[in-house]
Amino acid sequence: MNPRGKTFMAAAVAGMLMVAPQSQSADGPGPIPSEVPGPSTRQATAPTGRQVVNFNRDWKFAKGELPGAETPGFDDSAWQAIRLPHDWAISGPFNPSEDGYAGKLPWRGVGWYRKSFTLDQTDRGRRVYLDFDGVMAFPKVYVNGQLAGEWDYGYMSFRVDATPHVKFGQANVIAVLVDTRRHGTRWYPGAGIYRKVTMTICDPVHVAHWGTYVTTPELSDASATVRVRSTVENHLEAESQVDVEVVLLGPDGRVVATGSKSDTVPAGGSQELDQSLAVKNPQRWDIANPKLYTARTLVRVGGKVVDGEDTTFGVRTFRFTADDGFHLNGRRVQLYGACLHHDQGPLGAAFYPRAMQRQLEIMRDMGCNAIRTSHNPPAPELLDLCDRMGLVVWDECFDKWDGTADRVNREPLQQYGEKQIRNFVIRDRNHPCVVIWSIANEIGPQSGQREGMSAENVKFMSDFVRKYDPTRPVGAACHIPQMANQPILDALDLTGWNYGRRYATYRQRYPDKPIIYSESASALSTRGFYELPLPTGKTQYSRKMQVDSYDHNAAPWSDIADREFQLMETDRFVAGEFVWTGFDYLGEPTPFSREARSSYFGIVDLCGTAKDRFYLYRSCWRPDATTVHILPHWSWPDRVGQNVPVYVYTNGDSAELLLNGKSLGRRTKLKEVADSSYYGVTDKYRLRWMDVVYQPGELKAVAYKDGKKVGEAVMRTAGQPAAIRLTPDRQELAATGEDLCYVLVEAVDEKGTLCPLADNLIRFRVEGPAEIAAVGSGNPLSLEPFQADRRKLFYGKAMLILRTKEGPGGSVNLTAESDGLPAAHVTVSSRPVQ
């Protein structure tokens, strides 16, 4: 037993509380799987009559209040034809006079979406549902002119029952009113139907929405008990006798267990059928080997299968302890996490699975093994991807409770929270990646009329989460140390603390409760920007409104990465950290909130191009993976003969630096910090040559570990731009209308060396079954439109995002041109989906 007392333990998909019996011990992210799977649809594949239809095609959109737009006969012929997901604000234009907190984009307003569709006569008598993954904000859904449903939280998924309003064998019209004027935000929220929509057509007797709940109350290496609870709805006027069969499929798709149970479902009601199945020699879901099972649920009436669905789950144990952090499948795992906002950079809030997959691939390459969905429920596909990629998730429902989300002068907090938490938990509880339910972020004590954190509110929210899933800890991200001296946090199973070792006070009051560093760092930098002399303090920022990439700057309330590394080494009772943030995001452009439109916090820029800081984290979080990175660039025509400090980020413990073949000496990382100054800790994690005299040519770093060479890197002085280099992230795409290809655009000299100061305007042309979805450069100050066919390079680089067209596919040819440079070409393939 843990001598500190309370330890939270959990198991399996949403497993029951239990002790993990394994005795093995490990610390770190573990090996990274060599192959990243594509996104999962999580749609039913069981052999039933249920249809799950992609409802993203053939919409029309118009901005404005437009009275009568809900009626079927409304004239929408002049509306814009679009395909979901759609963020109406990302196309701009930017407003230079706006504050940058929400990205300077026109997200406030009213918009209408309309779509016509026809249902077969054979579907008469069946149920028709419309499932929205996320609409920003306050959507009202009309079917054939009748209000069919609405929702009041822009980040939450919801279902609309269209059955009473649809017609069969003739045209139906769905109209969605979206109103962001009442939405409150601290960052760019987007606007519109920004996540996918599906239409589900099923039998009147069917598995309820999110109606399958899988847990594993017992688990050992020899066997696992898998508990499957199936909620069946009956929309008939008479009771229905049902038989529910559950078939468990192993990671290889083979049947590993079956079970069946019968019960009566009352007319117009529902019934839960509870079954337990035994699985021999279970394969565990883990960070390095995320094995997944499938629970196939089949509903029979009168011996005939009338409905069914597949539910993905995983088998694992985990626990958080007060003294030793996080344990997964019996071994300690340090959480190396990143906070991610919901926007996809130049794509805005519009959610594309490939865009998220790419973000997660980049984070995992850095050494990330955990993601925090700050500060809202994510798109369901994010959790699908984390399940498949072996990333654990801090799943967050709300930001502040005092009016910065959709609860603006609305219903009482507890009533609002109950509705959102129900959908949040039952939607996500089958994901093995989810290990924490977070009910809030940075909520201060209750004062005046603000709905802040009170013991009553925290207990209510926590208990309501546990009502739907008692198998995971309930937490919140806190930022006011004084709150630890009050009973406000008593109802939480664990707490996250944001910044500056604020968790120390909480540790004193709650020595038996686990702690996690829910936001760390908030360091700041601009990709490719270097300014000398170096800053002497973390808040000494450039007058050019960019932030130096020598990685010396942070927000006033936060610290540079090295100081956080030191904390995590010292405070081993902390389960790990979630860095703010993995990627730059639209809005919150500290420290230039008036001038800029996107953040400087990211380890990776807005377009997904790594900053220098990426390699600092990689060298620390992946000590067994070769990392050798030199900064700054080596093109300083105005500093010949002057000092240019050189840093090397490496997983090695030492490195030698050579300039034009001449050694500038070998540096070794300190094992202990001798210098107590703010930047003294950097010598433990970086290698620095502060007295390098700049001469053009070749700068080379050779890294060593335990005396053996582990790798090298070279930086060369660039000549004048001579060519455009195009590098697609993938060669083969799917012709779905929603697949993406990210093409890195660079200016290079005649030898192929990146020109790090180039700012050429690049023009693009696409031929074939794809289109330009967006362009960007990672410049937080740029007010160039994202939806365009041209872009200025930012420190030598830009990014173009291609989106496929639905259809037979074919070759996609991209041409890039710039004045004075030869045209560049690249070809990728778009393949039809069978």
Where are these regions (language model features)?
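Extended carbohydrate-recognition surfaces in non-catalytic/accessory domains of CAZymes
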Residues: 28-131, 184, 190-193, 583, ...
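Short flexible loop/turn segments that cap and initiate beta-strands
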Residues: 72-75, 240-245, 287-294, 651, ...
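Glycine/proline-rich low-complexity spacer/linker segments in large multi-domain proteins
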Residues: 28-46, 148-149, 168-204, 284-300, ...
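Extended substrate-binding grooves/exosites of carbohydrate-active enzymes
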Residues: 81-87, 91-96, 151, 196, ...
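Beta-strand-rich structural segments
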Residues: 228-232, 298, 632, 646-650, ...
